[in-house]
Structures are given as C-alpha cells and as structure tokens.
C-alpha cells in the first residue's frame, strides 16, 4: 500500500505544472491493506502523510474535522462509522458552499464493497 501511495503522489506531483484536461493538482486519500490497514493523505506537492485514525480533505474539511474528532472512536461499528461520515460531510455542506449537496457512503470490508447510504441535502434558501 505504501508503494502505491508513493507512485500516486509521484504521478500527481509530476503533473503539477503540465497542462492537461485531466486535473493534476488534486488531493488524494488512499487506503488499503497488506500486512495491516493503512490510510494515506497525498498532497499535490508530493508529500505523503500516513494517518492512524481518520482524515478529511477539501474546502469543508475544517467543519468535517470537528465532527470526526467528536465522534470517532476505535472499534466503531459499521453503523456508527456510516453515521459519523454522514454527520461530518453534512456539517461541511451546511457551512461551505463548495462542498456540494450530497453524499454517497460506501463500506469496504474483506467481503467487498457496498453502498451504505446516499443522501442529498437541500442547501438552497427557500
């Protein structure tokens, strides 16, 4: 997983100053499992941070982090994790117009991947 993170960040960094219809200046979050579970925060400047618990990215991440820090705990149930994800993105959507207006939550396990929730939020003034 670490080598995949290194490869991805090298590709992103090498495209920072090149014109492309495919955005090269992006922020990636990469998770995976080999001998253990790993979560990486990859920046367009080529830096990589391995995180132990949770990570948020984007313009609304400041609001999302408040919820993540309040609700995250080791050994959460799947339902608690999905609820926390929805609450954190919802906090960002309510306070940051660039975050968007919906969320799709997927749960990834050894058995595969499944869609756990899909929610649209009305952020327009009525």
Regions found by a protein language model. Give the residues of each.
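Long, low-complexity N-terminal extensions
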Residues: 1-126
């Amino acid at each position: 997983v670490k080598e995949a993170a290194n490869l991805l960040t090298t590709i992103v960094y090498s495209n920072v100053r090149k014109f492309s219809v495919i955005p090269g200046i992006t922020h990636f979050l990469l998770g995976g499992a080999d001998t253990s579970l790993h979560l990486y925060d990859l920046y367009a400047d080529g830096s990589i941070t391995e995180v132990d618990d949770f990570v948020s990215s984007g313009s609304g991440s400041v609001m999302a982090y408040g919820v993540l820090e309040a609700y995250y705990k080791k050994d959460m149930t799947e339902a608690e994790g999905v609820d926390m994800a929805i609450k954190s993105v919802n906090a960002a959507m309510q306070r940051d117009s660039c975050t968007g207006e919906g969320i799709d939550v997927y749960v990834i396990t050894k058995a595969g991947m499944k869609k756990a929730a899909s929610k649209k939020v009305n952020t327009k003034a009525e």
